[in-house]
Amino acid sequence: MYWVYVLKNKEGRIYIGQTEDIEKRLEYHNRGWSRYTKGKGEWEIVLKECYNSRKEAIKREKELKTGKGREYIKEKIKNRGVAQSG
């Protein structure tokens, strides 16, 4: 299984990615091992979606990185805690 995930830090910054191991990937970001998230504080998962193939996950990741995708993320965050689908 593959996950598409959205992280948010205390400053309100958003990071969108995909992985096979979501917990390991969150640790990776919080230890500062990712160029984009390094030095930007603690990150938390605010949205996660599960897919059967990496191809599907990459497609969804790209969708979430569009204007409409970011609007979708903001609505999900606003309406509840950690959103999960799939």
What are these regions (language model features)?
Residues 1-66, 70, 75-86:
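GIY-YIG nuclease catalytic motif and its immediate N-terminal context
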